[in-house]
A protein has these predicted regions:
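Residue-level signal for the membrane-embedded core of alpha-helical transmembrane segments
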Residues: 22, 84, 108, 132-133
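Transmembrane helix-loop junctions at the membrane interface of multipass transporters and ion channels
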Residues: 114-127
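C-terminal ends of transmembrane helices
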Residues: 26-37, 87-100, 144-147
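Alpha-helical transmembrane segments and their membrane-interface boundaries
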Residues: 1-76, 123, 148, 163-168
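Alpha-helical transmembrane segments of multi-pass membrane proteins
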Residues: 25, 51, 55, 59, ...
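Canonical alpha-helical transmembrane segment with a positive-inside/aromatic-interface signature
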Residues: 98-99, 124-168
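Short hydrophobic alpha-helical membrane-embedded segments
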Residues: 80, 102-112
């Protein structure tokens, strides 16, 4: 149990958290849907919303059962991480020739959306909003960096020994 933690939240807080979890996970889902990724809008919303609801239920359990000293809201959060790990694992696939793996970003995105939903469920709005912004930074900015690195790597590899000899 979290010693000294205030677990009582109002119905207005609950509604706000559910709506915010839906909105933030929708923002990520729309970006994924736009790029035609396997886990799009609905999947991301379900993961974010579900994580928020599981977190709210665990927090509210302390209000509903005040005499139970062993209720610890963080236990549900730990199980969310495990559950999303299984869901994410289902999105990771080997290419037919087994030369590469696909779906890692999709799995990681679901994991982060679950973290955002859990943070909102706990009332950690700043963390959830900044986390969502960092997802967008990753998709919009870092993906361009990755593409540039891959392009340069391919250019370098295509020159083979000629490039190596030029550097001698």
């Amino acid at each position: 149990m979290l010693e000294g933690a205030v677990t009582h939240i109002t119905e207005a807080d609950i509604v706000l958290r559910i709506i915010l979890a839906t909105v933030l996970s929708s923002v990520v889902g729309i970006e994924r849907e736009y790029h035609q990724k396997p886990a799009g809008l609905r999947t991301n919303v379900m993961v974010g919303l579900g994580s928020c609801l599981f977190t709210l239920v665990s927090i509210r359990a302390a209000d509903i059962f005040p005499d139970m000293k062993a209720i610890d809201p963080t236990r549900i959060a730990a199980q969310i991480v495990t559950g999303i790990g299984f869901l994410g694992a289902g999105t990771i696939l080997f290419e037919k020739d087994r030369s590469s793996v696909i779906g890692l970003t999709t799995a990681a995105t679901l994991w982060v959306v679950a973290a955002v939903g859990t943070a909102i469920g706990m009332g950690l709005y700043l963390e959830a909003i900044v986390g969502t912004l960092m997802v967008f930074f990753t998709f919009l900015v870092l993906s361009k960096v990755v593409n540039e690195v891959r392009k340069r790597s391919t250019d370098h590899a295509s020159h083979g020994d000629t490039a190596m000899e030029a550097n001698k």
